[in-house]
Amino acid sequence: SKSSTETPPSYNQLNYNENLQRFFNSKPVTAPVEVDPMKNEQSYSISADARNTLSPVQCFEGSGGSGSSGNFTSGSQIHMSSITNTSNAGTGTSSGSAQLVSLTESLLN
């Protein structure tokens, strides 16, 4: 038996399939047809030199205000840099070779 305190399903939950069908019937533009990953990648990547010279602590120095959490000791800097992963192998990061796939109705079925 159901509990009387259980929340009944919302209108959107009850009409999920109809909403999905309406979405695909509207034929939305979900992604550009041609994407050049090498061209887009440069706009948000940091050069290797900048990555090696700035520790995570240095990036945020001066933004912590007057509280004690705003001042890190050099010991925490050493610890943070020692756990930084500089390899892309097995980390799930993209090397630019992955193909973007547009969301289509056939992928959901």
Swiss-Prot record:
Primary residence: nucleus
- Record localization: Nucleus; Cytoplasm, Perinuclear region
Quote the biased-composition stretches of kind Low complexity, using this chain's numbering. Answer: 69-98
Highest taxon in the source lineage? Eukaryota
Quote the cellular component terms of the Gene Ontology held in the record. nucleus; perinuclear region of cytoplasm
PTM note: Phosphorylated with a circadian rhythmicity, probably by the double-time protein (dbt). Phosphorylation could be implicated in the stability of per monomer and in the formation of heterodimer per-tim.
The chain's coiled-coil residues are none
Alphabetized, the UniProt keywords read: Biological rhythms, Cytoplasm, Nucleus, Phosphoprotein, Repeat
Q: Does the keyword Acetylation apply?
A: no
Bias (Polar residues) occurs at 99-109
Output one GO BP term: rhythmic process
Q: Where is this region: Disordered?
A: 57-109
Say what the protein does: Essential for biological clock functions. Determines the period length of circadian and ultradian rhythms; an increase in PER dosage leads to shortened circadian rhythms and a decrease leads to lengthened circadian rhythms. Essential for the circadian rhythmicity of locomotor activity, eclosion behavior, and for the rhythmic component of the male courtship song that originates in the thoracic nervous system. The biological cycle depends on the rhythmic formation and nuclear localization of the TIM-PER complex. Light induces the degradation of TIM, which promotes elimination of PER.
Oligomeric state and interaction partners are given as: Forms a heterodimer with timeless (TIM); the complex then translocates into the nucleus.
Under which name does UniProt file this protein?
Answer: Period circadian protein
> From which organism does this entry originate?
Rhagoletis completa (Walnut husk fly)
